[in-house]
Curated annotation (Swiss-Prot):
InterPro entries: Pilus_4_PilW, TPR-like_helical_dom_sf, TPR_rpt
One GO molecular-function entry: TPR domain binding
Membrane spanning residue stretches: none
Record's bilayer topology term: Lipid-anchor
Chain coiled-coil ranges: none
Binding partners and assembly: Interacts with PilQ; this interaction is essential for assemby of PilQ into secretins.
Annotated compartments: Cell outer membrane
Protein's name in the database: Type IV pilus assembly protein PilF
Short name of any one Pfam family annotated for the protein: TPR_12
Covalent lipid sites (N-palmitoyl cysteine): C18
Amino acid sequence: MTVRAALVFLLAVGLTGCVTSGDQNPLKTDKGRDEARDAYIQLGLGYLQRGNTEQAKVPLRKALEIDPSSADAHAALAVVFQTEMEPKLADEEYRKALASDSRNARVLNNYGGFLYEQKRYEEAYQRLLEASQDTLYPERSRVFENLGLVSLQMKKPAQAKEYFEKSLRLNRNQPSVALEMADLLYKEREYVPARQYYDLFAQGGGQNARSLLLGIRLAKVFEDRDTAASYGLQLKRLYPGSLEYQEFQAEK
């Protein structure tokens, strides 16, 4: 289970935005420098999205040459190093980004995701909590989902449930969050709401070993033998070597 970083394009600025006619140097004006910086960031993100991290560094470095304090450039470079499994360098870049823009919810959310991957759960929680304060952040539902996932790792299921509920209030179309709610409620023996959340998950989520096992367990609670059998066959066919299949066999 991983926390999803909300990596988005920063500005819709193309490289052609930096080109001017004549002998005028666009980097001599504030507007020209801003456009050049943003174009380089866009180019770097394009390489990053295609999985070419080495090539992504070149335009991102150029962006930082133009604007050494660019939070967006540092944040993008942090994701590059995170992808390359260079945690120390990624951490440094995230910190530089936040030094320039300490309230940037996107950077805080991405940094929280990085800290989660590093199992630094207390730090991740604090960064994500800061990100959640931005009520206008368009990916706020993802922040609450991430807070819920971190809370689970901190052994705080009640707190996790509150965050998952907040996430779903902001965006109902999140199968992964619905599955987390179904799992928590099943463990609390709240079977009716657990099934409701599971049905919400099933409407838009692809099944995996974990979800199939939960579906089997819920079907058994409600004595739905056909559904339990169907999920059992899928689990056997698709995930025969999984821990979930072993648990399913043991529970027969």
